[in-house]
Amino acid sequence: MKKGQVIEGIVQRVDFPNKGIVACEEGTCVVKNALPGQKVKCAVNKVRKGKAEGRLLEVTEASPLETGSPCPHFGSCGGCTYISLPYEEQLRIKEEQVKKLLDSVLCSQGDYQFEGIKASPVCFGYRNKMEFSFGDEWKDGPLSLGMHKRGSFYDVVSVTDCQIVDEDYRKILRCVREYFTALQERGIDVKFYHRLRHIGYLRHLLVRKAAKTGEILIALVTTTQLPEQVKKDAEESLLTEDKDLFTEVQILEGLKQALLSLPLDGRIVGILHTRNDAVADVVKSDETNILYGQDYFYEELLGLKFKISQFSFFQTNSRGAEVLYQTAREYISGYIQSSDGADAGKIPDKVVFDLYSGTGTIAQLMAPVAKKVIGVEIVEEAVEAARKNTELNGLHNCEFIAGDVLKVLDTIEEKPDIIILDPPRDGIHPKALDKIIRYGVDHILYISCKPTSLVRDLEVFLDRGYRVDRAVAVDQFPWTANVETVVLLSQRKADDYVEV
């Protein structure tokens, strides 16, 4: 197999993350965005040590597993790779991927309890947050608002019938795109921000909706590069006699009124205007102004209430998050109560560290079955939100510290009895992992959103005297290639292993 060669073959399986293994006469090639059983053409773009990687050119024959996509944007939108497969088949693929990765490192420890995969309680309309991009679907095409086209950094598909959000999102998306398209038709040149030339006004539309309360927060993200026909404020507009000029305030007021007039199932509690002049194509704020209502909303999980702002981290599938956190709580609570011989209502004398704690969701769920929970999170805004949420929920045994886990662990006087880990996708820094292991706690709970990072860290845990007792995959993201994994580790007795 040579670089540049076009091959055709059958996808034998899909490994995490989204790597289709294509078998052909010349050997095998790894290709993204392919499904098991598909016949595909791909171009080989890398050959190294006998292993080939390629780019998908065409699906020449559908997989016998495919049943058709309920989403009209499938194939053009880069979002939902698995949406043409039945949900049960998606779960089977994800379960096999996680089990294969775990087995690859746990074969040395012997048996462990793998509990399969837990399905999301809802498959359609499950997302509570979407970041839509402004752009065009082709060069100099009409204004688009939606998701990036598959394989493209620049082209944007208007996903007006997206299936992973509910109808309120779709109405808001259509409303905003039609509003700015109408302004363009009136000669007001509100262009999208061009990512190469770094010019333009419209950047992103952020929509968040609570699954339980139905509260909706909307944020329009723009640059400060106003179109020529638009002035910043009324005072600036008075300096010219051109009556066709608009102010930015007028444009934003018109958008606000258009949004508030929508017939929605949920309730808009806040509309924000965020300015962002950063070069990077990320949703961030240089300045945020409230156009309507407030800059936060409330969501409820497992009997707790959470105040969520524009940029607060929160699991994007609220009902799926309840399954994830119930699993984590059951793993830890079962250990605490059995080891103490305590009744379910009794609070044991245990200190829990929740590392990479985000907005403190897990910490607050663990608080009722622990003496104290200490959360550590590097994002200061998330820590502030965690502190406010503990007050909101009347929890007095939680402490949250803002800082890098690697550095903060050296400053905490308390010693943990149990450690909960929920790190970013790339896993735990090796030096932080060493400090965590040196506490020598009996049990560690590891929640991972990227199983390849998880198994890399598990190898270190196993080498340092821990074993995996229980593991389960949890599907938070139907139709996509992503999957969460929950693992409970316990410390082996000294005579069970030899450290070298």
Task: Identify the residue ranges that each predicted region occupies.
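Flexible, glycine-/basic-rich loop-and-beta segments that form/coincide
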Residues: 63-72, 154-155, 492-500
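Rossmann-like S-adenosyl-L-methionine
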Residues: 2-4, 8, 13-17, 217, ...
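Local cysteine-cluster metal-coordination motifs and their immediate loop/turn environment
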Residues: 67-86
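Internal alpha/beta scaffold segment
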Residues: 154-203, 224-226, 231-270
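Small-residue-enriched alpha-helical segments and adjacent helix-cap loops
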Residues: 80, 94, 98-105, 354
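Short, acidic/hydrophobic/Gly-rich beta-strand patch recurrent on exposed beta strands
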Residues: 20-25, 146-149, 219-221, 386
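Terminal RNA-binding accessory module
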Residues: 1-73, 150, 232-233, 399, ...
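Composition-driven low-complexity segments enriched in polar/acidic and proline residues
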Residues: 108-139, 151, 207-208
